[in-house]
Amino acid sequence: MSNDSSKAKQNQVDEAVEGEIITDNENETVTGEASLMDELTQANFRVEELEQALEAATAKVDEQKDSVIRAAAEVDNIRRRAAIDVEKARKFALEKFANELLPVIDNMERALQGTDAEAEATKAVYEGVELTLKSFIGTVEKFGLTVVNPQGETFNPEHHQAIGMQPSPDFPANTVMMVMQKGYILNERLLRPAMVMVSQGGAAVDTQA
């Protein structure tokens, strides 16, 4: 009887010990899981911080890239505007210079018109003025100056200025029958219109063009 009682007590002790072991194991498991979760949480926070830092760095790089692109575009614009300004200044200076030369050309042409090319007394003068005029015209043409001499051409109000109209059996209507003063174009821009007399008939001509 005493043996049975001893066995029963021993069993109770064993069960109590096993219960404590199980409890300790469960506590260790819970503690381990909590520690693992804490490590995972910290790792997630770290990943988020790194992602935010990466996004900030990427945004900074994009911003700097945009700044560089804008700066390069602005430099190109400045260069383009400077080139345009230089070209305008060059054309303006050339136009002003050409305008000063036109009266000289007109005077030489009038001198030729008023000089007898066949007379012995004036032949040498005529040839000298003619040669000078041709050389002068050839020089200014190198800089883009073009003579507008529309004798026999259809009246063009963009390049010609009609000073009058006359009936003529020798010219169709609206044809330049006489050039009173030559015109000039500088680099495709009208410097001075040609002063012309236009044949009468057909469509009317705007003499104020």
Curated annotation (Swiss-Prot):
Compartment(s) of residence: Cytoplasm
Keywords: Chaperone, Cytoplasm, Stress response
Compositionally biased residues, Acidic residues: 15-27
GO MF annotation list: adenyl-nucleotide exchange factor activity; protein homodimerization activity; protein-folding chaperone binding; unfolded protein binding
Main location: cytoplasm
Segments of this protein annotated with the region Disordered: 1-27
BP GO annotations: protein folding
The keyword Metal-binding appears for this protein: no
Origin: domain of life: Bacteria
Pfam families referenced in this protein's UniProt entry, alphabetically: GrpE
UniProt xrefs under InterPro entries: GrpE, GrpE_coiled_coil, GrpE_head
GO cellular component: cytosol
Compositional bias annotation for Polar residues: 1-13
Coiled coil: none
HAMAP family according to UniProt: GrpE
NCBIfam families in UniProt: PRK14139.1 (NF010737), PRK14140.1 (NF010738), PRK14150.1 (NF010748)
Function recorded in the entry: Participates actively in the response to hyperosmotic and heat shock by preventing the aggregation of stress-denatured proteins, in association with DnaK and GrpE. It is the nucleotide exchange factor for DnaK and may function as a thermosensor. Unfolded proteins bind initially to DnaJ; upon interaction with the DnaJ-bound protein, DnaK hydrolyzes its bound ATP, resulting in the formation of a stable complex. GrpE releases ADP from DnaK; ATP binding to DnaK triggers the release of the substrate protein, thus completing the reaction cycle.
Family recorded in the similarity comment: Belongs to the GrpE family.
Subunit structure: Homodimer.
Annotated protein name in UniProt: Protein GrpE
